[in-house]
Amino acid sequence: MVNFEKNINELQEKLISVNRVSKTVKGGRIFSFTALTVVGDCQGKIGFGYGKSKEVPLAIQKAMDKARKNMIIIPIVCKTLQHEINGYHTGSRVFMKPASEGTGIIAGGAMRAVLEVAGVHNVLAKVYGSTNPINVVRATVNALKKMRFPMHIAEKRGKSIDDILG
């Protein structure tokens, strides 16, 4: 993971990875760069972007723009998750569960960056299968999209919140 952080308009931006890729043509190879970034407001709003260009700064800028356009809202209370969640994308599977206050973010690589910009401070997480950063970010975002407030679940089932929480 590349160490790159920026705060613009209360959004925290993190660069997860930059790769050099090549296209082979008759005259040789054409090199270009890809960048994967995540953007969040540390209060439950998060987005990720993937940009590609012939130069690194342009690839990063494209990725940041895409991340700002594709933001979603996730329910976070007390700086942790509501319940255990699983997510997957292609060969990557992620498992996350809430942790008590003071635990911190126990997660690796790309998943850590996503959880930090989302505003989650206490979580236990694990990646199974492929650790490709793009797939891990997509799996993490898919898992976070599935999370629901206990109040909404209780309403849907026609029960009280106490019944849902056990």
Curated annotation (Swiss-Prot):
SUPFAM superfamilies: dsRNA-binding domain-like, Ribosomal protein S5 domain 2-like. InterPro entries: Ribosomal_Su5_D2-typ_SF, Ribosomal_uS5, Ribosomal_uS5_bac-type, Ribosomal_uS5_C, Ribosomal_uS5_N, Ribosomal_uS5_N_CS, Ribsml_uS5_D2-typ_fold_subgr. Residues 11-74 form the S5 DRBM domain. It comes from the Bacteria. Keywords: Ribonucleoprotein, Ribosomal protein, RNA-binding, rRNA-binding. GO terms for molecular function: rRNA binding; structural constituent of ribosome. Signal peptide: none annotated. One of its GO terms (biological process) is translation. GO terms for cellular component: small ribosomal subunit. With S4 and S12 plays an important role in translational accuracy. The N-terminal domain interacts with the head of the 30S subunit; the C-terminal domain interacts with the body and contacts protein S4. The interaction surface between S4 and S5 is involved in control of translational fidelity. HAMAP family: Ribosomal_uS5_B (MF_01307_B). Part of the 30S ribosomal subunit. Contacts proteins S4 and S8. Belongs to the universal ribosomal protein uS5 family. This is Small ribosomal subunit protein uS5. The lineage of its organism: Bacteria, Pseudomonadati, Pseudomonadota, Gammaproteobacteria, Enterobacterales. The gene is rpsE.
